A protein has these predicted regions:
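Catalytic beta/alpha-barrel core
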Residues: 75, 161-163, 213-223, 244-246
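Glycine-rich, positively charged N-terminal anion/phosphate-binding segment
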Residues: 6-19, 36-52, 63-132
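Active-site beta-loop-alpha junctions enriched in small/polar residues
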Residues: 34-36, 63-65, 88-90, 118-120, ...
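Active-site-adjacent beta->alpha loops and helix N-cap segments on the catalytic face
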Residues: 91-102, 147-172, 176-177, 193-195, ...
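Alpha/beta catalytic cores of nucleotide-metabolism and tRNA/nucleoside-modifying enzymes
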Residues: 1-35, 41, 47-65, 69-70, ...
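Active-site beta->alpha loop and helix N-cap motifs at the rims of alpha/beta catalytic domains
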Residues: 110-184, 189-197, 205
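Non-cysteine beta-strand/loop elements that form the S-adenosyl-L-methionine
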Residues: 85, 138-146, 206-216, 266-273
Length: 350
């Protein structure tokens, strides 16, 4: 775990308190855990070139690990209020120094910050929370990831069907972390029977959860429309903050969902990958944001593959097919910098 010597109070400053932000009455704009960076980029490439035969380099899981602090730094420059880490398996994090060093990197400017854990054991989760407590504002329990591996290991969305385990995990973190301002939140999907979801939310509220993020789809749903009406119903049945998540691609959509559901914030994943300046009101990625990414990624030592793939995703909708073909084939940082300078100079827009 790398923290650049962060003071133990840096993420508990009053002006950075997420709970207070959610109670402000203003839209809180949240960057999601981004657990599927590499899958999204793989999909991007297959969609962009589906009619052409191309070679796609294998995607490494290190893409998430090596770019996450840099990406959080970028979106914070463009009106993102709160960032999550990618999902970290609590058991590995607790048992392995190597896992901690590779999975969690932060710095003094990286706050407010929520560390999201995949967990199925209350003691291990609370151990993990104790480790990150000095460096983050809180932890989040992933109860919404529908990926097969996660559910097979007892993590993610299967937990919405294990309410007693979720309650125990929340309770143990609350009991063992002494800092009263350290938040404990959960991220869930909805049940087919919404009454079960509302019951779960009421129970975790009574146990002391700080807020709940609701992805408005069931475990089985992938590309179906998001059930914003279900999110609204959940919000109307609890008193704690609720964050809406699912298919938000612009600031206007974020504001519409916020107003439609009556929630306290919105969480965005894919929309921010495509346009990290989305929360600042940009409809497309401005060139300034691209150059900001270049500066941040190079300063933080982001490996080329991660650096390049983020740019590919940011520029996918604002470059032509021919430009994509050339840019995506670049194989060095210097080549990327030369391409950006030659084609776009330092203009503020594409």
């Amino acid at each position: 775990m790398r923290s650049d010597s962060i003071p133990t109070t840096i993420c508990q400053e009053g002006k950075k308190d997420p709970v207070e932000m959610f109670h402000s009455g203003q839209l809180v704009k949240v960057c999601a855990p981004m657990v599927r960076y590499s899958n999204l980029l793989k999909l991007l490439l297959s969609c962009s070139f589906r009619r052409e035969k191309i070679y796609v380099r294998p995607f490494s899981s290190s893409f998430t690990a090596d770019s996450r602090l840099a990406f959080r730094t970028l979106v914070r420059k463009y009106s993102c209020d709160l960032c999550y880490t990618p999902m970290i398996v609590a058991a590995d994090f607790v048992r392995s120094v190597k896992a901690r060093d590779s999975e969690f990197t932060t710095n003094q400017g990286d706050c407010p910050l929520i560390v999201q854990f995949a967990a199925n054991d209350a003691r291990l989760l609370s151990d993990a929370a104790l480790i990150v407590c000095p460096y983050a504002n809180g932890i989040d329990i992933n109860c919404g990831c529908p990926q097969r591996w996660a559910m097979a290991d007892g993590y993610g969305a299967c937990l919405i069907n294990k309410p007693e385990l979720v309650l125990d995990m929340v309770r143990q973190v609350r009991n063992r972390v002494e800092n009263p301002r350290f938040s404990v939140s959960i991220k869930i999907r909805i049940h087919d029977d919404l009454a079960r979801t509302i019951d779960l939310c009421r129970k975790v509220e009574a146990t002391g959860v700080s807020w709940i993020t609701v992805h408005g789809r069931t475990v089985e749903e992938r590309h179906q429309p998001v059930h914003y009406d279900a999110i609204k119903m959940i919000k109307e049945n609890v008193s704690i903050p609720i964050v809406a998540n699912g298919d938000i691609r612009s600031l206007k959509e974020a504001e519409n969902v916020w107003q439609m559901t009556g929630t306290d914030g919105v969480m965005v994943a894919r929309g921010l990958l495509a346009n990290p300046a989305m929360f600042a009101g940009y409809e497309e990625t401005p060139l300034k944001c691209v150059w900001d990414w270049v500066d941040i990624a190079l300063e933080l030592g982001t490996p080329f593959m991660c650096f390049h793939q983020h740019l590919m995703y940011m520029m996918e909708k604002i470059t032509s097919r021919q430009e994509k073909r050339v840019f995506n084939a670049l194989s060095s940082t210097s080549a990327v910098l030369d391409y950006l300078t030659d084609h776009y100079g330092d203009d503020s827009t594409f």
